[in-house]
Curated annotation (Swiss-Prot):
Cystine connections: none
Catalytic activity: adenosine(1518)/adenosine(1519) in 16S rRNA + 4 S-adenosyl-L-methionine = N(6)-dimethyladenosine(1518)/N(6)-dimethyladenosine(1519) in 16S rRNA + 4 S-adenosyl-L-homocysteine + 4 H(+)
UniProt family annotation: Belongs to the class I-like SAM-binding methyltransferase superfamily. rRNA adenine N(6)-methyltransferase family. RsmA subfamily.
Protein localization: Cytoplasm
Classification of source organism: Bacteria, Pseudomonadati, Pseudomonadota, Gammaproteobacteria, Moraxellales
Positions annotated to bind S-adenosyl-L-methionine: 29, 31, 56, 77, 126
Record-given protein name: Ribosomal RNA small subunit methyltransferase A
Alphabetical list of PANTHER family matching this protein: DIMETHYLADENOSINE TRANSFERASE (PTHR11727), DIMETHYLADENOSINE TRANSFERASE-RELATED (PTHR11727:SF7)
Length: 287
């Protein structure tokens, strides 16, 4: 790995040199802790020919050590000042296979970055915490061309994504993400690893899209509706939720039995397969 020159002072100096103030609306908190950067890069386990995409590179604290591990890399940066700074520092003159896309990560067609020659995408990034969930769901729509994703988010959100069934943090995000991907909690990142420090502790996690889903919902939009509606009333029993919801049908004892689910159970006790079976059964019944 190449020498990592980022620390709190160098980040501050770079921001001043670029006349750039971290923008709250972009959720800009710049990573500078060398040991954390090293841990993140090592956890990704890159190969030279990987089709690497970084979302929100910021000042390039992760970008440069990542680029040292691969032959080519694409970054997506909405902030034009930061994109221009990256282009000057590590652009075409120093690395001809470094591409910058100046755009909102939510507007990028990631399928265009895939090719049989370059392979599936390996996506990394320190996502803006204020819009992280929409970005994750946007990326899931390209799961068939993504090998894996490594992201840094608020620790509490990562705990929800990777939660085990029955735990306090298990919920809608756990079920939806684990339906589409295998999830791994990798490491915790303290507030002091950033400049300026965020208000919360962060964590890094991995999403690996299922090549073949272990269970398949007949209607994924309806599956998502069932998951959302049930967790909106997580303290109630499933029987009560389906009886009172205006969006879901009332289920009979036979309906629950067909899913092998106890109608007295609560949402946090159901695994992904249970939710799939429940949604497949419920969608056949008029509301």
């Amino acid at each position: 790995m190449s020498k990592i020159s980022f620390d709190a002072q160098s980040i501050s100096n770079s921001l001043r040199a670029a006349k750039h103030q971290p923008r709250k609306r972009f959720g800009q908190n710049f990573l500078h802790d060398r040991s954390v950067i090293r841990e993140i890069v090592e956890s990704i386990r890159l190969e030279r020919d990987d089709n690497l995409i970084e979302i929100g590179p910021g000042m390039g604290a992760l970008t440069e050590p990542l680029l040292a591990e691969v032959d080519a890399m694409t970054v997506v940066e909405l902030d034009r000042d930061l994109a221009d700074s990256l282009r000057i520092r590590i652009g075409a003159n120093s690395h001809p296979n470094f591409t910058i896309i100046k755009d909102n990560a939510m507007h990028v067609d990631y399928r265009e970055l895939y090719s049989e020659e370059r392979g599936k995408l390996r996506v990394v990034g320190n996502l803006p915490y204020n819009i992280s969930t929409p970005i994750l769901f946007h990326l899931l729509s390209y799961a068939d061309v993504i090998e894996d994703m490594h992201f840094m988010l608020q620790k509490e959100v990562v705990e929800r994504i990777t939660a085990d069934v029955g735990s306090k943090t298990y919920g809608r995000l756990s079920v939806i993400m684990q339906y589409h991907c295998h999830t791994d909690y990798l490491l915790t990142v303290p507030r002091g690893a950033f400049n300026p420090p965020p208000k919360v502790t962060s964590a890094v996690f991995r999403l690996t899209p299922h090549i073949i889903k272990p269970v398949v919902a007949e209607d994924e939009e309806y599956f998502a509706l069932v998951v959302r509606e049930t967790f909106n009333h997580r303290r109630k029993t499933l029987r009560a939720i389906f009886k009172k919801s205006t969006l879901l049908p009332t289920l009979s004892e036979d309906d629950f039995a067909a899913c092998a689910i106890d109608p007295q159970a609560r949402p946090e006790t159901l695994n992904v397969k249970d939710f799939v079976n429940l949604s497949n059964q419920a969608r056949t019944i008029p509301v």
